[in-house]
Amino acid sequence: MSSIFSCVSHYKTLCFGNNQFVNVNELQQNLQRTFSFSDDFKCRRLDVGGKHCLFAYIDGNIDKILLEQDVVRPLKNCERLEKPYLQSLQNTVAYADEIEIVDIKDSPQSVASCDVAFFIEGEDNAYIFSLRKPAARAIGEPPTSSVMKGPREGFIEEIKTNMSLVRKRIKSPDLVVKTFEVGRYSSTTVALMYIRGVADEKIVERLSHKIERIDVDGIVDSAYVLSFIQTKKNSFFIQAGTTEKPDVASAKLLEGRIALIVDGSPIAITLPYLVFEDVQDGYDYYSGDWRASMIRMFRMFGALFTVLLPAVYISLQTYHFQLLPIKFLMTLMAATTNIPFPPAIEMLLVLTLFEVLNQASIRMPRYFGISLSVVGAIVLGDTAVKSGLISSPSVLVVALSAIGIFCVPDQVGAMSILRFLYLCISAVLGFVGVIILTIILVAYLSSLENFGTPYLAPYAPRISPDLQD
């Protein structure tokens, strides 16, 4: 498909220029010259009511049955095609409400966008029919967001379907949708959705301006758009929410956020993003207030546990062992006496091995990933401990840290980096280094803003009404 858009971009001015075509023969030659490198481009001649007409489309991207039954067949039976042509077509074909008029020199772009272009001899406009094939994937529960309670619908790779899933939940004329065509060759549709009167109009304007300024060859996923709209691109903390569930996107819209839906991607982007969204989950709203609050506290504790546990272990073992009870200290010394590596190097090796196994299990096929996890966790870990290369307390610490990291799955990358940073500074300065890095981290998070919204809101600064959720 990229070669098609390349042809359109290169030949559109050469073939069409600013002149109206003379007849259908000339138009067909120009179109065939424009798409000369694409074997799937098709032209079809048709006489309608005494007028010479032409269809142009990309084979494989349109529903030929709909084209034949609902467009071509009614036009063949049309006795007279008169001006205004749009009204005549609307009175003839079944897809009357989906006819769009474009200038003839812009018609190759519409054809490359998987639509059907219809030309009438002597007319300087093209009439566009949207007859794309229906989505190949049915709406179902997204694999990354399975739930025990709640809606199980998920976004798919078709933008119109995704927008309708949101509109099904927010039936209001104040739900605004702005569309953009992004990508020099791909011309990918990006939909910006927000609720008028709830979302901040300044953020909407700023985000719209960022999208309009995107200059790239193509957009094939929402992650491409995200890389252009981030306020701080070098931060390892995520700055935008992502979801595959229309109910989550709708809930965030009702809270005043903005959603971006990209054609071809099942993942919607929500902005502005706050760090405390990481501990929120749709299942919380099916629990009582106290229970949901406790669950979120456990998630926050799990995140802190993940980041700090290896650093605290190294600090206690290396610098502050006098803080440990005597029996615990003797047990720890007995387990680590014959290990050939210093504690910090040992912990670094175990953490690195875990990250390698984790990345390998993610990228391997599902069934092999399970086998790899068993081999890595049981065989390699047990063998390394029995051979005396690493100590059992180090394996236990890394295992506990690995469990806690998935309490905030959206921040797994940031948690992994912070865990290594805390480990390195604790190996040099002990608890003093942990405290210093914590102060720096809190100051850094306090300085972050996401489209003018503080990253630590509603706690810093404190916004009392927003604390209710």
Regions picked out by a protein language model, each given a short descriptive name:
Residues K171, T337, L389, G430-F431:
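Amphipathic alpha-helical protein-protein interaction surfaces
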